[in-house]
Amino acid sequence: MEERLILVDTDDRPIGICEKMRAHHEGLLHRAFSIFVFDSAGRLLLQQRALNKYHSGGLWSNTCCGHPRPREALPDAVRRRLGEEMGFACELRPVDALVYRARFENDLIEHEFVHIHVGRFDGTVAPDFAEVAAWRWIDVPTLLEWMADEPSAFTVWFHCMIERAGLPVLHRWAHR
């Protein structure tokens, strides 16, 4: 059975449920989340999306992203997906939300109401390599330089979130 997404209005109020690929073909606004995990040295955990992802394969992005399932509380979904995708758990806290829309080369459209969460973790990362091609810890100045030099190496939503919240702000939230 195909994954189903929670459709929302621009205030994040649920208005329906839809199959994932239909939502992405039609550009329907749906609930999502993005996670930024920092270590105690202040480095951000990045992931490179698996090459076979339905869009943005091979691009670098924040620690983890996902969608809550129908009737799944957002905090539960955030914890679940971090464990599934990156193989660890840590305390995560919500810090911001934004709406973005982007069309991809394969004509899929991401239109998400994204809840941004931050956390701190210093343990072992054990990603699911069906989801993640590679991962690395990176300090904020090096990441910002890399993003300026190679913007096309990163996902659209990662750029949106960095422009909205800024890595230093996310880092401060993670270390409170």
UniProtKB/Swiss-Prot annotation:
Its cofactor is Mg(2+); Mn(2+). Mn(2+) binds at H24, H30, H67, E110, E112. InterPro entries: Idi_bact, IsopentenylPP_isomerase_typ1, NUDIX_hydrolase-like_dom_sf, NUDIX_hydrolase_dom. The active site is at C65, E112. Residues 28-160 form the Nudix hydrolase domain. The keyword Metal-binding applies. Its main location: cytoplasm. Pathway: Isoprenoid biosynthesis; dimethylallyl diphosphate biosynthesis; dimethylallyl diphosphate from isopentenyl diphosphate: step 1/1. It holds the Pfam family NUDIX. It is an enzyme of class 5 (isomerase). Binds 1 Mg(2+) ion per subunit. The magnesium ion binds only when substrate is bound. Binds 1 Mn(2+) ion per subunit. GO terms for cellular component: cytoplasm. One of its GO terms (molecular function) is metal ion binding. It catalyses: isopentenyl diphosphate = dimethylallyl diphosphate. Keywords: Cytoplasm, Isomerase, Isoprene biosynthesis, Magnesium, Manganese, Metal-binding. One of its GO terms (biological process) is isopentenyl diphosphate biosynthetic process. NCBIfam families: IPP_isom_1, PRK03759.1. Belongs to the IPP isomerase type 1 family. Catalyzes the 1,3-allylic rearrangement of the homoallylic substrate isopentenyl (IPP) to its highly electrophilic allylic isomer, dimethylallyl diphosphate (DMAPP). This is Isopentenyl-diphosphate Delta-isomerase. The gene is idi.
